[in-house]
């Protein structure tokens, strides 16, 4: 029987102090403009906080309001993919009661039950809120806090910085957030920007696969045997998932293959000279393209291709001339992808991001997940307890049926529910 969801309230949380008129217009960078208007969505599951429901809500409301003073663009409204009007209209906050124990959600291997904890209609951004929060209460006393942040104001790193600052403000009343809001100071605003060509589909399913630490080490050893030096966890897991996705695509296409491209978002903060701090907020990333011919399906070669494509991001200058040239190169690649001659896959890694440090005052989360995506052929990687990696994979139904039964994949990963 499906869990019953009951809405308790819906309101808007505004900054506790008004944003100065001098900060009213927050210009989008070229990266902000290029990103499709979607939400970055995360849900954090906790056992019973051990305090009254009204106190939890008051604590979250007050701390969010104070945090928004420093993250003032998050409480504004997007204007014509050009800038954010920092008008303090606020963040949408929904509170619901889910009539089932939290364990009923965590035991699922599909995304259906998990999706209950996310606000309705957050597959694409609302015009009325760049951030949407949903507080979920369960029969057992446990709670889940879902946070959806528009990709127009932050990438994954910036979104998690905001959530951790909010949690720290709730936990320690003296905490003062100190985000570095980059706006268009690093990546200049462009008059004409091509969006990343996401492929949306209503026939997608999302499954989560967990790679234990020991199996990741086996994958790394396999890559080393083929000549790849010091492969990373993300490189080997991504390569295996990509290989299995290509095999699933071929099995559903009468054994025929098409050229494909893997688009990876690369966090530029550590690569820039000088590097940007973790509290930098904006879309501070570039796109890594790995184009694969139809006969290049072996894991070692895929891992090597991913490494080679990433090397170009070493020791980047923050000079405008460099970024302009990169945007021109990116624009040409996007034009090729928009021809429809490639199968396009996407991968975003949130590994090593402090998602399990989000403590609102009642302990760290027992489980963190993301929402079912409507972007087909999408892979999101996230750390899981015990040095594991959780992969949230979104494919069309027929392709997923082949993918989730791939023996190679299942020899390293499990179709998994939360512990």
Swiss-Prot record:
GO terms for molecular function: acyltransferase activity; acyltransferase activity, transferring groups other than amino-acyl groups. The keyword Protein transport does not apply. Optimum pH is 6. It catalyses: rhazimol + acetyl-CoA = akuammiline + CoA + H(+). Pathway: Alkaloid biosynthesis. A motif (Nuclear localization signal) lies at residues 206-213. Optimum temperature is 32-37 degrees Celsius. The active site is at 151 (proton acceptor), 359 (proton acceptor). InterPro entries: CAT-like_dom_sf. Gene3D superfamilies: Chloramphenicol acetyltransferase-like domain. PANTHER family: ACYLSUGAR ACYLTRANSFERASE 3-LIKE, F21J9.9. Monomer. This is Akuammiline synthase 1. It comes from Alstonia scholaris.
